[in-house]
Amino acid sequence: MYKAIIMPVDVFEMELSDKAVRHAEFLAQDDGVIHLLHVLPGSASLSLHRFAADVRRFEEHLQHEAEERLQTMVSHFTIDPSRIKQHVRFGSVRDEVNELAEELGADVVVIGSRNPSISTHLLGSNASSVIRHANLPVLVVR
């Protein structure tokens, strides 16, 4: 089916990813690789240069925490763990999805989404932003 599948996840809101895991596995069934992507907010150190060292330590802590949670998430899959890669990046979800997709030559994005609320309709969501700006097919799982 698909060889490179990007699955953006929020490791601090795992329930959004549970259904998406099964769909990603289905799409990867013929030796595909699932690339879990967690995106942390872009660096605030540019505006807080007096506190740059503290901000950097905090970012390193967040990255380490995200990497640990991604590793835990791998256990939710039934496919061989060697076919699941983990990526933690800083920036906006939509930009990092497109950048990783280009780097990998990815085939599809699988993203979990919740039912829209009034705030989502007004402000948008990561899933809708990815859909609007993606350069490849996106499967949204609710």
Curated annotation (Swiss-Prot):
Highest rank taxon of the organism: Bacteria
Family annotation (Pfam families): Usp
Name of the featured protein: Universal stress protein G
Taxonomic placement: Bacteria, Pseudomonadati, Pseudomonadota, Gammaproteobacteria, Enterobacterales
Listed CDD domains: USP-like
Primary gene name: uspG
Family (UniProt): Belongs to the universal stress protein A family.
Cross-referenced InterPro entries: Rossmann-like_a/b/a_fold (IPR014729), Universal_stress_UspA (IPR006015), UspA (IPR006016)
